[in-house]
Swiss-Prot record:
Alphabetical keyword list: Cytoplasm, Endonuclease, Hydrolase, Magnesium, Metal-binding, mRNA processing, Nuclease, RNA-binding, rRNA processing, rRNA-binding, tRNA processing
Family: Belongs to the ribonuclease III family.
Full protein name: Ribonuclease 3
Domain RNase III: 6-133
Length: 232
């Protein structure tokens, strides 16, 4: 990773680091560390970044939404501090193209993997915190998460269970995921849709909702719950 690449990343982030080693580490996946033994990878920074992000978002919500209950604030925070939101940030700054990883990881789709990009965002937050301090990283987080915060407050975030399901299944190789509309009922202005999700010709989830998209998301969520339960 040369200094021109680092400058490009810094411009995308809106942060210019004093310690570029922190930025390099934040962008280094563990697979790269396994391939190049001297490389420090980003898992420890990710651990710290998660806590920094939680603190800054919690503090912001606490100070700015005094009419919200603890339960409401917790729900809002869970929509902001989650893998899907982190992935949205990663996409905006084209983070996937800068992450250092092994050739094997890249060949199997690692550069597009949601979890890898989300983890890298948390690692970058930690790197900014260590390099610039809590005041700077607070402003950095609020700048990049502003749109997501507003959507969470206005209840406009739809959890993308379909993408998460695809991400989970990609770990085991190529699979065929199909969403099948089985029926709908109710008047046109309040129609309810029912959908199955079929994975490699096997029924794995059922969902319903007042749009086809909502029904598919709920079917994907049920499939995720089943699959993640099997992995425990």
């Amino acid at each position: 990773m040369n200094r021109y690449t680092l400058k490009e990343i810094e411009e995308n982030l809106g942060v210019f680091f004093n310690n570029h080693t922190l930025l390099k580490t934040a962008l280094t996946h563990s697979s790269f560390g396994n391939q190049f033994k001297d490389a420090e990878y980003n898992e420890r920074l990710e651990f710290l970044g998660d806590s920094v992000l939680q603190l800054c978002i919690t503090e912001y919500l606490f100070n700015n939404y005094k009419h919200k209950t603890e339960g409401e604030l917790t729900k809002i925070r869970s929509l902001i501090v989650c893998e899907n939101s982190l992935y949205e940030i990663a996409k905006k700054i084209n983070l996937g193209s800068y992450i250092r990883m092994s050739k094997g990881e890249e060949i199997t789709g690692g550069r597009e993997r949601i979890s890898i990009q989300a983890d890298a965002v948390e690692a970058i937050i930690a790197a900014v915190y260590l390099d610039k301090g809590i005041g700077f990283v607070r402003d950095f987080i609020l700048l990049h998460f502003e749109e997501i915060i507003n959507k969470a407050i206005n209840n406009e975030i739809v959890l993308d269970f379909k993408t998460k399901l695809q991400e989970l299944l990609q770990k085991d190789g190529e699979v065929v995921i199909q969403y099948e509309l089985t029926k709908f009922e109710g008047p046109p202005h309040r129609r309810k849709f029912f959908t199955n999700v079929v994975i490699d010709k096997k029924l794995m989830g059922e969902g319903s909702g007042y749009s086809k998209k909502e029904a598919e998301q709920n079917a994907a969520k049920q499939a995720l719950d089943i699959l993640e339960g099997k992995h425990e």
